[in-house]
Each structure stands twice: as C-alpha cells, then as structure tokens.
C-alpha cells in the first residue's frame, strides 16, 4: 500500500504537532521542551510515538536530546 502525499504516519503527525507547540508557545533556541509524558498528553498519543516524533525532529535539526537532561530547541 502506497502512502499518498496527504497521508502521514502518526510519528510524522506528532512531530508536526510538536513543531506547532514550539512555534505557538514562542519557544526559542535553547528552550527545553516538556518531557515525554507531557508531550504525549499534549499531542494525544503514546510515549513511544512521541519518542519517534522526537527522533524525526532531531534528524531534521529542530531539536537536540541531552540524555539525562531533556530535549531542547536547536
């Protein structure tokens, strides 16, 4: 089954929601994102989906994860 341009996987949709959260809340470079539990609640998804979405955002250069500290806007 081919994915059409309009259909996006849940982690991709969640990454877009997180981008919207960043822009909608005026977060700047260096600001810390909420933790996985909070992002899951904000986005209405599970933590594993949030983790996948964060990986996409890391790959795109939007955020960086500092182990033991959190996820920060890049």
Each language-model region and where it sits:
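Short linear motifs at protein or domain termini
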Residues: 1-74
């Amino acid at each position: 089954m081919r994915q059409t341009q309009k259909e996006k996987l849940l982690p991709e949709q969640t990454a877009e929601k997180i981008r919207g959260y960043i822009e909608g809340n005026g977060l700047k470079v260096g600001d810390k994102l909420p933790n996985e539990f909070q992002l899951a609640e904000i986005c209405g998804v599970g933590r594993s989906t949030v983790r996948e979405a964060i990986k996409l955002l890391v790959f795109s250069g939007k955020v960086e994860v500092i182990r033991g500290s959190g996820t920060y806007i890049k």
